[in-house]
Amino acid sequence: MTRETAKRKIKGFPFAMQSIAKEDIENRAYKTVEIVPLFEMEDGYYQMTVNYRIKLDDGYIHGKALSIEDFIKMHDEAERGEVFTIMYLEKSRIILEIEEKND
């Protein structure tokens, strides 16, 4: 993922998180996990996006779905036990990419 693409993906998050995320992007501090996530909707919407979080062993990671329909689709897939590959920024814990793992 290019730095420019990563910077576009952090828009809409709180400014404090964006500031930390910019450092993560410059340092290429990306992490990837493969899990069956438990999605939790967070407070607030931003121009029809849905903010959500996923609990990992070491805390929460935060993401945005483009619409409520996208969020429900991901949530339903996870409920069925589908494994997702998630790339997120190490310190800011913002999800850059999330996709269902295809075996």
Feature map (PLM): residue ranges:
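OB-fold (S1/OB) nucleic-acid-binding surfaces
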Residues: 41-67
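Generic low-polarity alpha-helical segments
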Residues: 1, 18, 26, 54-56, ...
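Structural detector for short beta-strands of small beta-barrel domains
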Residues: 2-49
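Short nucleic-acid-contacting surface segments enriched for D/E, G, S/T with interspersed K/R
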Residues: 67-87
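Intrinsic disorder/low-complexity segments enriched in polar/small residues
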Residues: 5, 35, 41, 80-83, ...
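OB-fold/S1-family single-stranded nucleic acid-binding modules
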Residues: 89-103
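Beta-strand secondary-structure signal
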Residues: 34, 51-53, 83-85
